[in-house]
Amino acid sequence: FPDARCAEIAATETPSGIVAVARKPAAAAAPAGNADCVLLDGVQDPGNVGTLLRTAAAAGIRQILLAPGCADPWAPKTLRAGQGAQFLLDIREGIDLAAFLEGYAGQGVVTRLDAPATL
């Protein structure tokens, strides 16, 4: 594949030179109410979402729930930051996190940028 053609069709400024076509994996029927998971709420930067997905995959967490308003986990910049982690994860988009947490039986750790205190 010529570099010029790759640069022409790439969605990023510095394409890696690798081109592939892949299907978006189907999510399971319903989020598990007790599995380890990462919940993302309001994370709008594609690079940050990709990094969080990559970190979750490295930690062995497979379920990722994104609230409305998060960056698209399948956007080119998110895929690049995720380095393929998306294909190891069960990613759910548009999740009502409050409703999910009502039935969640696992333990949780909450972090937020605007919290009044640190952990």
Question: What positions do the PLM features span?
Answer:
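RNA substrate-binding interface of SAM-dependent RNA methyltransferases
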Residues: 2-7, 21, 25-116
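Glycine/small-residue-rich phosphate/adenosyl-binding loop
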Residues: 13
